[in-house]
Amino acid sequence: MTGSHRTSHAGDGAPEDDLGTFQTLEQFILDRQDSFPHSTGAFSRLLRDISLAAKIVNRDMRRAGLLDVYGSTGERNVQGEVQQKMDALAHREFVQALRRGGECCLIGSEEHAEAIPLSTVSKEGDGKYIVLLDPLDGSSNIDVNVSVGTIFSIYRLPDGYEEEEPDPAAALQPGTEQVAAGYVVYGSSTMLVYTTGNGVNGFTLDPSIGEFLLSHPDIQTPSRGRLSSINSGYYHSFEEGLRDYLDWLQQKDPETNRPAKTRYIGSFVSDFHRNLLKGGIYMYPATESSPAGKLRLMYEANPMGFIAEQAGGAASDGHRRILEKEPDKLHQRTPLFIGSEEMVRRAEAFLQGEPERALSA
């Protein structure tokens, strides 16, 4: 990571006085509220509700080995994927937290076929936010104790929306319309990282006081990284341009940080978080079996794309900017190339059959 950040935090044996050097998430939101174009108390409360749900999920994650929350529910979600018990639990916690708060009128979740209406829309401005999320990304890794995460994206109802009952179609907005996005990574420590379009900031949960504390202010990702994250087991099902790019990454050239180091956990949040801080590219391309890609545009690619761009990186489907894609359904899939800008632009050039443009970059 090239931006400055604190590397220790209260709860690691630091004196109590050191707490004064840290800012809580709630304090940070209130301090920045005036610089946010949609500044309202409702938005601040919405972020508080999301962070509360994340704390509850984190608590249950820490006790997963002692509770009956490993394994699957025996059911499949709308994606056709086997639903893990922690998937269902995390979905329930986020829905309950957002329903209690009243700031969110619609929630779209990976675990539910349609957007869920949560509240009516008031003329005073309450209930005008839409939250799209993957409640627990990488949940198949839980029973082997690998880091997992939550991804969320926040929109407002379109200007001029007059209906009291929220229309699920209102959730289908391009990523450029996001007012905030973030993720939580449940790892050796629990971090919440988010943006409102004014940079990216990270907060580490101090379990001793139950607060997210600012630990990574103004995150900037290196423009050129050395990490490559992709499931290379599908190499022979990738299109030729991508295979050429992967081969190029493994050639030795210190001037362009090659050969790249391959790091792939299989948990999108964890892989993205590492590459955001250290510099690299995460790739989940189209394959023969998934020609439209595998990741979901609305609650995986768009929020992470917003964060990547705000940190100085880039996000593309290989041919165009992710945030500009027009959605036609909640669970729409997309290929994704995201991370350090120079690496994403080179990947695009190879995919578009212009390797000479990549080599001259």
From Swiss-Prot:
Instruction: Name the GO terms of the biological process aspect.
Output: fructose 1,6-bisphosphate metabolic process; fructose 6-phosphate metabolic process; fructose metabolic process; gluconeogenesis; sucrose biosynthetic process
Query: Which InterPro entries does the record associate with it?
Result: FBPase_C_dom, FBPase_class-1, FBPase_N, FBPtase
What is a single cellular component term in the Gene Ontology annotation? cytosol
Signal peptide positions are none
The cofactors required by this protein are: Mg(2+)
Q: Where does Mg(2+) 2 bind?
A: D134, D137, E300
User: Localized where?
Assistant: Cytoplasm
Q: How is the cofactor bound?
A: Binds 2 magnesium ions per subunit.
- Annotated protein name in UniProt: Fructose-1,6-bisphosphatase class 1 2
* Gene name, Swiss-Prot/TrEMBL: fbp2
